UniProtKB/Swiss-Prot annotation:
Identification of the protein by name: Minor capsid protein p49
Species this chain originates from: African swine fever virus (isolate Warthog/Namibia/Wart80/1980) (ASFV)
UniProt keyword list: Late protein, Virion
Gene Ontology, cellular component aspect: virion component
Protein family: Belongs to the asfivirus p49 structural protein family.
Length: 438
């Protein structure tokens, strides 16, 4: 049912598989195991079967393919800790992005989160082996430069105009996992103690947020496992934590962009693509623009508790620097918009109750956040079973039935939406619309 709906809606995308999907080896495609797990009845994930002719995993051919999801966004539902590709109630049509606004040959797909943070990092990492990269050198110059270019920022085509020399942080801005560390040809040693923000010269902040603070911010959107969140609740990530890679903010920005539906500002085209240097560093202004876009999405779609925002020590000072890029954030914060739990109604309705607040850190059991353990659920596509999330985060309830002819605009409002309030002891206001001038 879900596959038929997606196929009809995105038939034109199926005929044009992106270069990224065709070039990436199957054994590095974590999401294939998710697909096989959901559509082959093997909850541990079946081994992908590569089909040379259809460029799709054979065992999952009747399930949703990654190319089906190119133009979907996933709701920021705080109660969903572990959403896979197959949960159709989490699929929503997302407004198409003009191709001249994206780095055309990079796929923007939302990763399927698991309970293991290492998997979160590994499956969003760009591998360093030469053969695993798209042939960017073969793209036309016009495609290489199809990047969102705000007029207020320095030219991205000429790194010399950037406020920070592009070579200064070259050793800090590669995507990698621990397995790839020995393979990197970097200048100098990468140390956990090196925060990009601390490396900047001058009396003013050039745009980077130290990765520890970005990690805190983006974890609010990701809702990472409690084993990592309990460290965040302690006002900081211990630098010796193996989950925290030196370039965690870059990797989290990449995965958060796909998770929130915020278009990621594509990286600059590589000068050294023959060595697999697919990604070059972001300029400082470019980095800040991406973070502000993500923050905008998080604030606009999440229930935010001010005491958690206050746990991020640098955020208050950084909102001022976001002002030229994202007036919404600056204005919202200045008017104390975040003093209460505020939920903005998204553009598209969803069956899932998106009004639930993020987990209350005070409600913990041995340092663990109150999450619904999806590993105890048996997912079956034969009886159209949709898990009911009954634990921890508010009183979120999902309908157990799903219309065959799904249309996001026809989904009835949940009781929380109708009442414009949250159930339980969490008070909030639901705003049905918001002026862009906020």
């Amino acid at each position: 049912m879900y596959h038929d709906y997606a196929s009809k809606l995105l038939a034109d995308y199926r005929s044009d598989p992106p270069l990224w999907e065709s070039d990436l080896p199957r054994h590095n495609r974590y999401s294939d195991n998710i697909l096989n797990s959901r559509y082959c009845g093997n909850k541990n994930g079946a081994a992908p079967v590569y089909n040379e002719y259809t460029n799709s995993p054979g065992k999952a051919e009747k399930g949703l393919q990654l190319s089906d999801l190119r133009n979907f966004s996933f709701m920021l539902n705080p109660q969903h800790k572990n959403i896979g590709y197959g949960d159709a109630q989490d699929l929503e049509p997302y407004s198409s992005i003009p191709k001249n606004k994206l780095f055309n040959h990079f796929k923007n797909y939302r990763p399927a989160f698991s309970t293991h943070t290492e998997n979160l990092i590994k499956r969003n990492v760009v591998r360093t082996e030469k053969k695993t990269f798209p042939q960017v050198s073969g793209l036309k110059d016009t495609q290489k430069n199809c990047l969102t270019q705000p007029s207020s920022l320095p030219s991205l085509k000429n790194p010399k105009n950037s406020s920070v020399p592009s070579t200064r942080f070259s050793e800090h801005t590669k995507f990698f996992s621990y397995e790839d560390l020995p393979k990197l040809r970097t200048k100098g040693t990468i140390k956990h103690e090196q925060h990009l923000g601390d490396q900047m010269p001058g009396q003013y902040y050039n745009g980077y947020i130290p990765h520890q603070d970005v990690y805190n911010i983006l974890c609010l959107a990701h809702k990472l496992p409690a084993s990592v969140e309990k460290e965040i609740a302690g006002r900081g990530i211990p630098l010796g934590n193996p989950h925290v890679k030196p370039n965690i903010e870059q990797e989290l920005i990449k995965s958060t962009s796909t998770y929130t539906g915020v278009p990621m500002l594509g990286p600059l085209p590589p000068k050294d693509s023959q060595h697999g240097r697919e990604y070059q560093e972001f300029s400082a202004n470019r980095h800040m623009l991406q973070v502000s876009n993500i923050l905008h999405s998080v604030f606009a779609n999440h229930s935010i508790k001010p005491q958690i925002l206050e746990d991020i020590p640098v955020l208050n000072a950084q909102l001022a620097s976001i002002k030229p890029v994202s007036p919404f954030l600056n204005k919202a914060y200045q008017t104390h918009y975040m003093e209460n739990i505020v939920t903005l109604v998204p553009r598209f309705k969803s069956i899932a109750n998106y009004s639930s607040p993020i987990p209350n850190y005070s409600k913990r059991n041995n340092g663990q956040a109150e999450y619904f353990d999806t590993s105890k659920q048996t997912i079956s596509r034969h009886n159209n079973y949709i898990p009911k999330y009954t634990g921890g985060i508010g009183d979120s309830r999902l309908d157990s039935t799903f219309p065959k002819d799904f249309n996001a605009s026809s989904v009835p409002l949940t009781s929380a939406e109708k009442d414009h309030s949250l159930r339980g002891d969490n008070s909030a206001c639901c705003i049905s619309s918001i002026s862009p001038s906020l």
